[in-house]
Structure formats: C-alpha cells, structure tokens
C-alpha cells in the first residue's frame, strides 16, 4: 500500500480533519479516528507546498486528505451533489489518497480569509469568483500558486481542493486497507 501517514511534526502542517468532528456539512463525525493519510507521491508534493508556504511565513491547514471509499459513500448519500462531491461509483481522488483539502494559516496560526468556509457548496467557493473581496482573491491565488508550483492540480468549484494530475491512475482504497482504520 502506498498510503503514508501525514503528521504535523513530519510535514510541518496543521491538521484539523473536518470529517472527524461534527463541524462538517453532514453535522456528524464521518471518521471515528482522526488520521491523515496521502499516497506517497501526494505526500511528496504536500511537503514541497508546505516548504514553500513556510518560506512565506505561512502554514498549511489540512481539512481532509485520504477519504476511505466508505466515507465517500456516506457523504454522497447525505448530499449527492456532483458539483462538489465525486460520485463514489466513479471514485474520488480522495479515496485514492491523491487529493487534499486545505487552507493557509498566517504566522499567528489564524486562517487567511478565503471568502467561504471549507465545504461551502456555493458558487462563492469557485476559483475566480468575482463576488469576493480582492484581498480574499489574493489569498486564494496565493494558495493556488503554492499548490500548483508543488505539482498539484486544482478543482474549479472548490478553492480548498487540490489533487495530483491523472488521479484516476491511482487505485481506490477502503478503510480495511489502512494500518490505523479511520471508520
């Protein structure tokens, strides 16, 4: 298995997995255990982005990374919206370990304003939305630049979502494949 655990100490990132708490669009925890995994190639790209952020006196905060296929089904059953969630019958980049949902923190640990909260299923979350303030656009573009220069692709509907290119080439994983189960 090519999934490795992402820890704050090893990657110098902040981890706040939204689906391990009730603070997500379902209103209930989806993960029983807050463990952050990524495919080893995605982990290398995350490390590069984290290093670039650190050079600007910023840090990455991860809201979600690997998502077991069972969790993708739970989210889809709750909100089957193909503009914001991958249909689990096709497979999500998250369930392949090659996607990450994240934001930027300033030097004090405060999140930079991004115009919406994570998982706000609204057009205001789209990259390039002109209905958010210019300073907020700047923050989104800063995140976009850090991630794309590190080898990530973006999803146009979600300012927080990045995935490796050619994500479908990676296999899907369920909870049973993990060294420390999440579900």
Predicted segments with their positions:
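Segments that shape or occlude catalytic/ligand-binding pockets
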Residues: 68
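Extracytoplasmic cell-surface/polysaccharide-interacting catalytic and binding patches
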Residues: 1-65, 77-157, 165-183
């Amino acid at each position: 298995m090519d999934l490795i655990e992402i820890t704050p100490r090893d990657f110098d990132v902040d981890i706040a997995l939204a689906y391990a708490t009730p603070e997500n669009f379902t209103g209930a925890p989806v993960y029983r255990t807050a463990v952050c995994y990524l495919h080893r190639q995605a982990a290398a790209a995350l490390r590069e982005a984290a290093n670039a952020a650190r050079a600007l006196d910023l840090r990455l905060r991860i809201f979600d990374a690997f998502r077991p296929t069972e969790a993708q089904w739970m989210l889809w059953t709750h909100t089957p919206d193909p503009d914001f969630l991958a249909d689990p019958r096709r497979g999500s980049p998250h369930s392949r370990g090659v996607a990450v949902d994240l934001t930027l923190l300033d030097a004090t640990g405060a999140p930079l304003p991004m115009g919406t909260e994570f998982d706000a299923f609204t057009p205001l979350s789209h990259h390039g939305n002109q209905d958010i303030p210019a300073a907020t656009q700047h923050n989104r573009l800063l995140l976009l630049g850090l991630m794309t220069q590190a080898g990530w692709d973006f999803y146009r509907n979600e300012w927080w979502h990045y995935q490796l290119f050619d994500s479908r080439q990676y296999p899907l994983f369920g909870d049973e494949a993990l060294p420390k189960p999440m579900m």
